[in-house]
């Protein structure tokens, strides 16, 4: 199999899916990876699930995702007071999946805060902030007593009873050896999940080098309790439900998903 151009989100939650990949990997934020995958600058990428909903021509690596079946911890709205009193929420532009999940949840609950990209205007309204990934983890640990945290994974589970799929391995349709790539990625996931202590040790060492303290106990709980790495029947149902709600609320055309699985 020839070398392929692989991209991956640069968050702790992706480590069990990429650690040990034998070739070069280009790490970036989800939105940047989606753009590069669309342009053909990458052939394979672990990107936001919304990218597949928007462009379902990609093939999906079956049985692999970043998902949650309840609280995810690292996709949250930080706010003070009741969420129903929040007048503005500052969005995180790094992930369209998180932004559109938030839009769906708010719409289904009948909440109508103003959603802003960038620093909100000084309107005097109570504010919230959507935070994702490692930034959300650090923010929660540094400001645990100063804010309340509306966990989008938890709210999705309450609303639908289903898991939520945040990211998928997508392969461009013209890549000839997609089945071989998918098989290697599934095998890599299985190897890493069998060795979570090594994943945790690497993560602790890396964040220590960057002067960012993330306790080992938290990481162990994060990988075992908050995250799921499969893409089975219930995850597919969750993704279809997300697509349905995005269609209902005008974020996507209404259509049934056809999963091009490899």
Residue ranges and their predicted role:
Residues 1-262:
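Domain-level signature for soluble enzymes in the chorismate/prephenate branch of the shikimate pathway
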């Amino acid at each position: 199999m020839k070398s392929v151009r692989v991209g991956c989100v640069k968050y702790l939650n992706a480590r069990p899916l990429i650690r040990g990949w034998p070739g070069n990997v280009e790490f970036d934020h989800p939105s940047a990876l989606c753009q590069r995958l669309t342009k053909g600058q990458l052939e394979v990428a672990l990107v936001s699930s919304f990218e597949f909903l928007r462009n379902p021509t990609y093939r999906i690596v079956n049985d692999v995702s970043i998902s949650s079946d309840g609280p995810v911890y690292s996709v949250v709205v930080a706010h003070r007071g009741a969420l129903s009193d929040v007048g503005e929420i500052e969005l995180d532009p790094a992930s369209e999946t998180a932004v559109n999940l938030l839009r769906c949840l708010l719409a289904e609950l009948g909440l109508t805060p103003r959603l802003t990209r960038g620093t909100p205007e000084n309107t005097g309204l109570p504010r919230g902030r959507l935070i994702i990934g490692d930034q959300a983890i650090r923010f929660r640990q540094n400001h645990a007593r100063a804010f309340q945290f509306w966990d989008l994974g938890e709210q999705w589970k309450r609303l639908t009873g289903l898991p939520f799929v945040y990211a998928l391995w997508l392969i461009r349709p013209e890549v000839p050896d997609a089945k071989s790539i998918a098989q290697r990625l599934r095998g890599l996931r299985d190897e890493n999940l069998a060795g979570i202590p090594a994943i945790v040790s690497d993560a602790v060492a890396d964040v220590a080098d960057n002067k960012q303290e993330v306790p080992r106990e938290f990481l162990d709980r994060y990988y075992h309790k908050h995250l799921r790495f499969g893409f089975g029947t219930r995850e597919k149902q969750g993704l279809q439900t997300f697509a349905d709600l995005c269609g209902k609320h005008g974020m996507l055309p209404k259509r049934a998903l056809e999963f091009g699985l490899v």
